[in-house]
Design a protein with these regions (language model features):
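Residues that form generic nucleotide/phosphate-binding pockets
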Residues: 15-19, 34, 166
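Glycine-rich phosphate-binding loops that contact phosphosugars or nucleotide phosphates
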Residues: 36-172
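Active-site phosphate/pyrophosphate-binding segments
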Residues: 27-30, 171-175
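Short hydrophobic/charged patches on amphipathic alpha-helices used for structural packing
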Residues: 29-32, 82
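HTH-adjacent hinge/linker in prokaryotic transcriptional regulators
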Residues: 1-27
Length: 175
């Protein structure tokens, strides 16, 4: 049985140092520009990413706009949105692996409806990243226990907060 190792603080410190680099900062700005034009933000994720989606919903709603998370991806009627409503929605998809089947299938629905999707994932080479309008990758070492992915979610948490504050700043600067 594989057991998780102790938390590698240096990996997280390195991520935080990289977060202000031009590439990552540019992706955050690009995603924020898309979200600033939306009236509603929908968060999706499975497993620990679902917990972060719920956090994102609360955090975004507190800072700048109405948002929600989808707890049960298949039972949510995303395909029932009108074209007009779809234009007002932005999706933030959270997935460490970027390969979560339920998340991928929902992204397909969103893309088909013309909804912009922002992926926050560990690699921009993942399927979810390739499907999304904008990808914000965080590139940290993945870790699995015998039953689950136990990769740190701190980078994704940080990116959700930074993205929300960037959108808020953009909207407050507009006349």
């Amino acid at each position: 049985t594989a057991q998780p190792k102790s938390l590698d603080e240096t990996m997280l410190i390195h991520f935080l140092q990289r977060s202000s680099e031009e590439l990552l900062e540019g992706r955050i700005v690009q995603a924020a520009e898309l979200l600033a034009k939306k009236e509603f933000v929908l968060f999706i994720g499975e497993g620990t990413s679902k917990v972060l989606a719920e956090f994102g919903e609360i955090y975004f709603s507190s800072i700048y706009n109405l948002s929600a998370s989808v707890s049960h991806l298949f039972s949510h009627p995303v395909s029932k949105l009108s074209e007009e409503t779809a234009k007002k929605v932005g999706v933030i998809a959270l997935s460490v692996s970027g390969e979560t089947q339920k998340v991928r299938q929902n992204i397909d629905y969103f893309i088909e409806m013309g909804i912009d999707v922002i992926a926050i994932t560990n690699s921009e080479k993942s399927t979810i990243a390739q499907l999304s309008t904008v990808t914000i990758p965080y590139y940290i070492t993945t870790e699995k226990s015998s039953i689950a992915d136990v990769t740190s979610q701190l980078p994704a948490l940080f990116l959700i907060e930074k993205l929300a504050k960037t959108v808020s700043t953009m909207l407050n600067e507009c006349p």
